[in-house]
Amino acid sequence: MGWAKLGTQLYGYAGNARVRTSATLSCDGTMSAYTATVRWSRNGDEGFAKGRYSRAHEWAFDGGAVVPASASPDNVPPGTADEAGVDPEEAFIASISSCHMLFFIDYARRDGLVVDSYVDEAIGIMEKDADGKIAVTNVTLRPRIIFSGDQPSSDQIDRLHHRAHEACFIANSVKTEILVESQAG
């Protein structure tokens, strides 16, 4: 196992798995470490060798949240996905939307606006990319935002979305095209 020293904490890497031995997160933007634990186990003799095993698993996060997860039913044999679980594709789209929303709301606040609600029905498109690999190539955010008090102009909303997109850590980390189709509250 190789080790990377981050401040005074050690993080181990064994193959593709990262093991956190303790956490020190900086607030200055220079470095932060985030973890998730993904758990799956085979349930008896369920046709594993033939690909007929459950894709249901769980994601656990450092704050204590445990989320049921599964492969998308669109990508695995029928009956092997748990449709109630969050699939990685949905989580990817939600993480982009959530990051954008959090920055948008904060920038609106800084501009003296009051956001009452923000609902985004984001959609992602999975298809072959330019290299012929299956990827989420496009995510369209479709936020509906309701403000109290002073109402922003459509230009101001566009500028807030641009600032939010430029600041979003997730958007800065992916090659997926991200579009925003702002909708009237």
Identify the role of each PLM range:
Residues 23-94, 103-185:
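Extended beta-strand/beta-hairpin segments
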Residues 18-22:
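Compositionally biased, low-complexity segments
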Residues 12-17:
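Short hydrophobic alpha-helical segments enriched in small aliphatic residues
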